[in-house]
Amino acid sequence: MNPMIFIILLATIMLGSSIVMMSSHWFMTWLGFEMNMMAIVPVLMKKYSPRSMEAATKYFLTQATASMILMLAIIINLMYSGQWTIANMENHTASMLITIALVMKLGLAPFHFWVPEVTQGIPLSSGLILLTWQKIAPLSLLYQIHSSINMELFLTMSLLSIVIGGWGGLNQTQLRKIMAYSSIGHMGWMMAIMNYNPNLSFLNLLVYILMTSSMFALLIFSSTTSTLSLSLAWNKTPIIATMSLIILLSLGGLPPLTGFMPKWMIIQELTKNNSTILPTLMAISALLNLFFYIRLTYSTALTMFPTMNNMKLTWQFQNTNILPMILPLITISTLALPLTPLFLMLN
């Protein structure tokens, strides 16, 4: 893809999300989502292949369906309230339809099926945008209407997403699918706390974006897409493989890494609100995520991936100048747990 066209598309994606985040008018919100969707589809298939075309088509159909449901909900709400402002959510049917539309855009269960397939079929750089930036706009809209959302429906979807995010990643060897199921699980944690403390939900989003961006940066740098290629990274640059494994454990929420902080704060907040069964089930389900991350770490660091090929290995990367650039991001993604009291005070 032409670099200038790519920059224009990225600017349009950011503009569409910014319109959604800053708008208080339903039509402008819908328009922002449409701008975002039409700009990201070419980005998903920037490296033309049948697989990327299929992934972009699946993404387009899913997002178009969600936008259609969103517009239907906006019209229903307009009929009952007579206003276009987002703050006026008086109709329960419209509220439920908007929730379903935003859940489809986020890729939460039970509308999660497109996330692993689309992520697997696109380049790593496009996957980074899909699993990080594309979550901000729907979450910002949920933040504005969270008081009007059916709490039981929301919590059910959240718990189901955490469970599916764990179960789905258990038998995966492709790192992009593992990151996709990890995204589904993390979105479940954010949704679970949205009704109780939406600020904490956005703190979780910030930590998730930092960890996911660090992981994708290392995968892009090492051209790693599977467990086999990750295990071979030891022969190229051991520090890359080591940092990748530490970030994977942080994504799994293993203390004392950064990923443990939002889970700790969310469980604490739910317990304060006299909810004990939900955080217990969430913590148990999160062990599934932690299990496949630890298994991936073990198979990569302590064993060699089985292969019958006598392949010639590259012993080092040609260019390591990018490492100092991503080192601060990796440090925050793994060692920010001591900052927890500060976030608790700000919360």
UniProtKB/Swiss-Prot annotation:
It is found in: Mitochondrion inner membrane. The keyword 4Fe-4S does not apply. Keywords: Electron transport, Membrane, Mitochondrion, Mitochondrion inner membrane, NAD, Respiratory chain, Translocase, Transmembrane, Transmembrane helix, Transport, Ubiquinone. GO terms for molecular function: NADH dehydrogenase (ubiquinone) activity. Core subunit of respiratory chain NADH dehydrogenase (Complex I) which is composed of 45 different subunits. Interacts with TMEM242. PANTHER family: NADH-UBIQUINONE OXIDOREDUCTASE CHAIN 2. This is NADH-ubiquinone oxidoreductase chain 2. It comes from Crocidura hildegardeae (Hildegarde's shrew). The gene is MT-ND2.
